[in-house]
From Swiss-Prot:
Single GO term (MF): glutamate-5-semialdehyde dehydrogenase activity
Pathway assigned in UniProt: Amino-acid biosynthesis; L-proline biosynthesis; L-glutamate 5-semialdehyde from L-glutamate: step 2/2
Functional description taken from the UniProt entry: Catalyzes the NADPH-dependent reduction of L-glutamate 5-phosphate into L-glutamate 5-semialdehyde and phosphate. The product spontaneously undergoes cyclization to form 1-pyrroline-5-carboxylate.
Listed Pfam families: Aldedh
Species name: Bacillus licheniformis (strain ATCC 14580 / DSM 13 / JCM 2505 / CCUG 7422 / NBRC 12200 / NCIMB 9375 / NCTC 10341 / NRRL NRS-1264 / Gibson 46)
Protein name as annotated: Gamma-glutamyl phosphate reductase 2
Subcellular location: Cytoplasm
Catalytic activity annotation: L-glutamate 5-semialdehyde + phosphate + NADP(+) = L-glutamyl 5-phosphate + NADPH + H(+)
Main location: cytoplasm
Catalytic EC class: oxidoreductase
Keywords carried by this UniProt record: Amino-acid biosynthesis, Cytoplasm, NADP, Oxidoreductase, Proline biosynthesis
NCBIfam families: PRK00197.1, proA
Top-level lineage group: Bacteria
A biological-process GO annotation: L-proline biosynthetic process
């Protein structure tokens, strides 16, 4: 280990220790204190908007010079509306029920010993993410409301934005009963800083990565700290033979074009061959109208003008753009097999008017979120009524799907007796 990496390691460990110490007081914070802290964060973000946007402009300029694509720049960019959305999101989280201290179950043993299962914070959350300044705010708000301290490690491309946001949040916390040490930010842009977080098992209770597949895979494969995996979204929509044409096209266009750069956007369209034969003109018009570039299998290329032949990488790709892979299938089984092979267990949808076909799809496909006649864009904490989310888990333990406040808690068992001993 070099002197530089030793210094980085020491700095990160110091921050993790501070977060762990702050987590002790957060466990005892009242709902009122946590809500007041969130309100203070919201106020300070609005009051310091000019400063935040000025710093964000530095990141955008640097990103463009480095040749980042439009989708990347979009995720990186802030404006007045987005900062106001951050503030509103914090206030919405404040309005949600406190997930801590809830009695999940209780019972009395035959010997009179009373048992209770109660929700408690996870402790210290390590958040590793890329060019997403919104995560800095969203993750902090959810962590504090659920009684957790947080260590933030954003991508180097958003360093000015994140530094400004955390500075403002620290100022806000200084006016509340929540310690500023509950929010730690790793300023180092050295890649070794991220790797140091992987090994902080003594101080950090869980790591949550948010970003591209390479980042998530690196964390999952190398961390000794437990990981809540937020997988990439290679989302599919299957248009069944008995799909309503207007409904199918509307849902498909929404899922692909509403926000192409997010993880719940459509990436692969699977179309039943009979439906495509009968509705190709309407589908082609919709694709052309919205500037969607198709990468298709042999049948799709034959039937959709301008379609490019799809390779193996296209079926695996999270485009995050207006590119769309299209497969023509002869049956529900073929569609489900394709999803089983290439899906990332994020969000999958079927469009059909046949309830039995829909039931078969919903029972067969393995994913965190499944839809019948609805867009995959609803896989979102806010859209599903959870409030904000810290990420969308594609694993099965300890949480799956959009992770809101309850997913940032665990439990402890409390037993109350009167001199009970085990015989």
């Amino acid at each position: 280990m070099t002197a530089t990496s030793e210094s980085i390691s020491a700095q990160i460990e110091e921050k993790a220790i501070k977060a762990k110490t702050a987590a002790k007081s957060l466990r005892l914070a009242t709902e009122k204190e946590k809500n007041e802290a969130l309100a203070a964060l919201a106020d300070h973000l609005k009051q310091n908007m000019s400063y935040i946007l000025t710093e964000n402009a530095k990141d955008i300029e640097a990103g463009r010079k480095k040749g980042y694509d439009a989708a990347y720049i979009d995720r990186l960019s802030l404006n007045e509306d987005r900062v106001l959305d951050f503030a509103d999101g914090l206030l919405e989280v404040a309005e949600l029920d406190d997930p801590v201290g809830e009695t999940l179950s209780s019972w009395t043993l035959d010997n009179g010993l009373k048992a209770e299962k109660v929700s408690v914070p996870l402790g210290v959350i390590g958040m590793i993410y890329e060019a997403r300044p919104n995560v800095t705010v969203d993750a902090t708000g959810l962590a504090l409301k659920s009684g957790n301290a947080i260590v933030l490690k954003g991508g180097s491309s958003a360093i000015h934005s994140n530094t400004a946001i955390v500075s403002v949040m620290h100022q806000a916390l200084d006016s509340t009963n929540i310690p500023r040490d509950a929010v730690q930010f790793i300023e180092s842009t050295d890649r070794s800083a991220t790797k140091q977080l992987f090994k902080m098992k003594e101080h950090i209770d869980v790591l949550i990565p948010r970003g591209g597949g390479a980042l998530i895979q690196e964390v999952v494969e190398n961390a000794t700290v437990p990981v809540l995996e937020t997988g990439v979204g290679n989302c599919h929509i299957y248009i069944d033979r008995e799909a309503d044409p207007e409904k199918a096209i509307d849902v498909m266009i929404n899922a692909k074009t509403d926000r192409p750069a997010v993880c719940n956007a459509l990436e692969t369209l699977i179309v039943h061959e009979k439906w495509l034969e009968e509705n190709s003109a309407a589908l082609i018009n919709a694709l052309n109208e919205h500037g969607i570039q198709v990468h298709g299998d042999e049948k799709a290329v034959q039937m959709i003008p301008g379609a490019r032949p799809a390779g193996e990488a296209d079926w695996q790709n999270e485009y995050l753009s207006l590119d769309l892979a299209v497969k023509v299938a002869g049956s529900l089984e073929e569609a489900c097999d394709h999803i089983e092979t290439y899906g990332t267990k994020h969000s999958e949808a079927i469009i059909t008017e046949n309830p039995e076909t829909a039931k078969a799809f919903l029972n067969t496909v393995d994913a965190a979120a499944l839809y019948h006649n609805a867009s995959t864009r609803f896989t979102d904490g806010g859209a599903l009524g959870f409030g904000a989310e810290i990420g969308i888990s594609t694993q099965k333990l300890h949480a799956r799907g959009p992770m809101g406040l309850k997913e940032l808690t665990t439990c402890k068992y409390i037993m109350r007796g009167d001199g009970h001993i085990r015989r």
